[in-house]
């Protein structure tokens, strides 16, 4: 597996933590199969609960992903919107189905689905939702609208 998101995220996490201890458990996801991810999410929820019970603080789940890759601006925004619609509802099954059906090259769809499954298992009576912080494409910087990558920031919570 050539996963590199932890290498990208770790420096940001270290800056945010400052002098406080930082405990990180990277999880690499190698499948997009919903049944496997659902089971892994249930197991991850048990780990998260044990982490919380030790110090009283809730652990943070952080998922890194680009959105659609290397299509034109219009196509990328359309595909991103389809994936984001499912993500904003906290619906792992819909996210995975949409990405597969629409041919969306979102590299972190499976890790995001895993996080949704884990949150649903961790708090079964709570609704899992997300809010969009920002959505943009690489064209905002490169001005090349022919081949863009989509980026989105989501804040995900259970309530």
Language-model segment annotations:
Residues 1-59, 70-159:
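Flexible, D/E/H-enriched segments
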Residues 61-63:
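Residue-level marker for buried hydrophobic side chains located in beta-strands
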Residues 67:
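Active-site metal-binding loops of divalent metal-dependent hydrolases
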């Amino acid at each position: 597996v050539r996963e590199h998101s932890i290498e990208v995220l770790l420096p940001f996490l270290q800056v945010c933590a400052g002098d406080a201890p930082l405990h990180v458990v990277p999880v690499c996801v190698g499948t997009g199969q919903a049944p496997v991810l659902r089971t892994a999410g249930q197991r991850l929820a048990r780990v998260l609960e044990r982490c919380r019970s030790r110090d009283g603080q809730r652990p943070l789940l952080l998922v890194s992903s680009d959105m659609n890759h290397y299509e034109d601006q219009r196509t990328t925004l359309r595909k991103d919107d389809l994936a984001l619609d499912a993500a904003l509802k906290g619906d792992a099954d819909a996210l995975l189905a949409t990405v597969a059906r629409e041919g969306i090259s979102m590299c972190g769809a499976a890790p995001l689905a895993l996080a949704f499954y884990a949150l649903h298992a961790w708090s079964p009576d709570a609704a899992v939702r997300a809010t969009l912080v920002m959505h943009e494409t690489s064209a905002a910087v490169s001005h090349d609208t022919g081949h863009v990558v989509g980026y989105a920031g989501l804040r995900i919570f259970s309530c």
